[in-house]
Amino acid sequence: MADMPISNNAMATCLWFDKQSEEAAGLYCDLFPDSQIREVTRAPGDYPGGKSGDVLTVDFTVLGRPFLALNGGPDAGFTDAVSFQVFTDTQEETDRYWDALLADGGEPMMCSWLKDRFGVRWQIVPRVLMEGLRHPDSATRERVFAAMGEMQKIDHAGIEAAIDG
């Protein structure tokens, strides 16, 4: 049982899955530091969409942030309008997150975006990219922006080369 119920937070993100909430939470918690499954709530009896013992919700944290995964059925889906940005310091960290989130059916997108196998959208964003996009020199910002526009997964060395001119 969790030390503190999710309702003790001022706010939490709820992710609506068909029936994969426990699998998704497990992937995210295994991948990211400061992440854990805190509580799994199961149906106390049979109901129209399932049976007693089915997972209803999973209370978990990712990178220290509270989430609730809900097995709500197939009526809702994820969209490009909402994504989770994860900031990275090294190419190895970028590669690890990118590859793990794409495994088993994810879809890469341009400019650091991807859709994982559950349909959740992520942006794996190297901090060097953000530094380049905020650079005080407009020509540097333009080079970094152009380099990013050619990439799916961001290549740290490519962004550093764009910064250096």
Residue map of PLM features:
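A short, polar/charged loop-to-alpha-helix boundary motif
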Residues: 129-146
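Short aromatic/hydrophobic contact patches that present stacked aromatics
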Residues: 12-14, 57, 83-85
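Basic/polar N-terminal segments that are highly enriched at the extreme N-terminus
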Residues: 1-9, 156, 160-165
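Vicinal oxygen chelate
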Residues: 17, 21, 30-31, 62-63, ...
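Terminal, contiguous helix-loop blocks that mediate binding/assembly
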Residues: 145-161
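Core segments of cupin and vicinal oxygen chelate
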Residues: 5, 15-64
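Short, small/polar residue-rich loop motifs at catalytic or cofactor-binding pockets
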Residues: 10, 54, 107-109
